[in-house]
Regions:
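Alpha-helical coupling/stalk and coiled-coil linker elements that connect catalytic or binding modules
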Residues: 1-279
């Protein structure tokens, strides 16, 4: 078909725009001349053409991702694809702008600035994000203090308990002190009878054994509550932050869609240049 012959686009977005152009040919002479000027520029500057096609190829199908964002159905890895795609915007603007081609400059001047959104996405999303919420880390470290602490507790609980144990040994001077757990009253500090006189006043005695006493502290009770509900709370926090992130993307949809149209335009015209060179 004619589309198959002419399609040298580097992205699905460009391929869709090409089909639209072929099904509804433009009749405006000025628009045709503008398109031709851009095509001729890339025919004459083949290094720029190859670089542009590579960049556009790396963008992927931003239109599809944005449509999912608008519906609130965008998945975490699609957010990362969106970020990777948008990150090509500035290099493309630098590559194509200031070349002395009025039509090209006009296209580039209409592109929106993605820097703020890119910075936000990069700061908020985990660099190796899970495929969906609840299946691993989605939100980056450093975004939410409670989330960071809960992750540390959930994944390094034993290390944390050893830290508490060592700290209390040093503080009280009780070398045999150890931390344990049972289903009756949770985490406890166990002290042998020979050292029970060294127990701090704020410790609460919970159980007396033949040779030892067991105590609880406010710190251990707080830790217990955190670790037992850590995964559930981690999920809740990530859901909340991710919803805010999706809302941020949705607030920028108009700008992203405009950029997609311009990138599609460049994709089609660079494809025409590629076709002209090879034929």
């Amino acid at each position: 078909s004619l589309v198959e012959v002419m399609d040298r686009c580097s992205s699905p977005m460009g391929a869709r725009m090409l089909r639209t152009w072929l099904s509804m040919p433009v009749m405006d002479l000025q628009e045709l001349e503008s398109r031709y000027a851009v095509v001729q520029h890339f025919i004459d500057n083949r290094d720029d053409l190859m670089r542009l096609q590579t960049m556009i190829g790396d963008i992927g199908d931003l239109e599809r991702i944005i449509s999912r964002a608008a519906a609130g159905k965008i998945m975490p890895r699609e957010v990362m694809q969106l970020r990777r795609g948008l990150s090509q915007t500035e290099p493309i603007m630098k590559l194509c702008g200031g070349k002395g081609v009025e039509a090209l400059d006009e296209l580039i001047s209409k592109m929106g600035d993605c820097a703020e959104l890119l910075e936000y996405l990069g700061r908020t999303m985990h660099p190796e994000t899970a495929s969906q919420l609840g299946k691993g880390d989605v939100i980056a470290a450093g975004v939410n203090e409670e989330l960071d602490e809960l992750r540390r507790i959930a994944r390094h609980g034993k290390d944390y308990l050893l830290e508490v144990q060592q700290r209390e040994i040093e503080r009280t001077g009780i070398p045999s002190l150890k931390i344990g757990f049972n289903n009756v009253f949770g985490y406890y500090l166990e002290v042998r009878n020979t050292h029970k006189e060294s127990v701090p006043e704020e410790w609460i005695r919970k159980q007396t054994l033949v040779n030892a006493e067991r105590y609880i502290t406010e710190e251990l009770k707080e830790y217990e509550q955190k670790i037992l509900g850590a995964e559930e709370r981690i999920y809740a926090i990530e859901v909340q932050i991710y919803a805010e992130l999706v809302a941020k993307i949705q607030a920028n949809i108009a700008m992203i869609q405009k950029n997609c149209r311009i990138l599609s335009h460049l994709d089609v015209l660079s494809g025409f240049a590629d076709l002209a060179i090879s034929n």
